[in-house]
Amino acid sequence: MKICWKWYIIELYEYNLFLGVYKINMKRILKRFGSYLKHVDKILPIICIAITVFDIFLINSMVDNGIINAATARTQRIAAVIGIVGGFIVSLVDYKFLSKWWFTFAPIALILQMLLFVPSLRIKIDDDMAWLQLGRFTLQPSEITKFVFIITLATHISKLGDKINSLPHLLLVGVHGLFPMGLIMIQGDAGSALVFLFIFICMLFMGGLSWKYIVLGLSAVPLIGYVAWNYIMQDHHRKRFLILFDKEMQQEELLDAYLQQYRGTIALGSGQLTGLGFESDNYTYTPFIENDFVFSYIGMTLGFIGCMAVVIALAVLCLKLLSNASGAPDQLGKLMCVGVFAMVFFHSVINIGMVLSVIPVIGIPLPFLSQGGTSMMMMHICMGLVVSTTCHKEKVKHMFYTEKD
């Protein structure tokens, strides 16, 4: 009987000890979370979530109008929630910690890209094999690779510092940038390859690249253009460029290569100033309007006013990203912010340019608005990376903080 009482006392003591430790840990977590909320950039997430809510509204209206099915809309909503939560989690982690672990992210991104060469796993559209089929879901690896590319390239350039203008080091940085571009080009996704190129150029410039290399690069543009036009681009790529300036070709390709852009331009203008609303019977059919041509749908339903509101929102987002870059505490943080800015800016300008028929159709989605789960998720996660650079300026004790940090 005495032994039983002893065991009871020991268990009771251990239970109270556990409760005490639990209370201490909870207090510590709440304190750190309060510190996080104090330092975190609240404006950037609000902008992104506001645009996302607007997108969900658009997607639901497309379901009501029979443009997409309910399952597609549900996938987009789930992707938005996962992206927002993922972005929040990334923002909790110090961006310097993410930089140190680049060697774990890079192989994952590479494996996902290489899986596109497995015929049974990929979805091939024309010559573009940019999507993986994983059970009931599709995944676009290049969107994940953009996030990893920004982290790895920022880490590489920040570690070099002034050595970036040393030719051997610059050549290694060039290999770092050209490898994912080349891999994605082989897979037929020229649009994503151009996004990587723009990110690469902007981050190089931010990294302190010498003007002599910049001038040399600009002088080589005609030669690079000639080689790309004659030896890299395929016939359908060249046709998309030529069709913008050739009225006769536009008529010939009205039901083929020029169909989406032609119908998208008509849909965009049909809304005039205030749009046709969400219950009109006079919608203009545009192939895949929910994807790369969602800006046409906005113009058709909400008119010029709706389009300008979207342009202003994206412009404010880009300016906020640049502001965060200027306020980042070190070169690594600045490079990460500039990389995300370059991605959002290029996506926005090229996508709207495609709809306005001033840029060829190259399959680049409009940030936070085009239907596409992977793009939606990774956009929010990239924003979480930018937020991390602002809320970890000081030694903020975040959730993953240790005394060794």
Regions flagged by a language model, labelled:
Residues 127-131, 215-309, 329-333:
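Hydrophobic, glycine- and aromatic-enriched re-entrant/interface helices and adjoining loop segments
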Residues 305-348:
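Hydrophobic transmembrane alpha-helices and their immediate junctions
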Residues 25-46, 50-51, 57-187, 342, ...:
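Membrane-helix boundary/helix-loop-helix interface segments in multi-pass membrane proteins
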Residues 93, 152, 232, 236, ...:
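Transmembrane alpha-helix boundary/anchor motif
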Residues 83-85, 103-110, 165-185, 190-230, ...:
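Hydrophobic alpha-helical segments of polytopic membrane proteins
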Residues 17-19:
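Short hydrophobic targeting helices and cationic amphipathic motifs
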Residues 5-7:
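Tryptophan (W) side chains
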Residues 157, 194, 199-213, 282-306, ...:
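Interfacial segments of multi-pass membrane proteins
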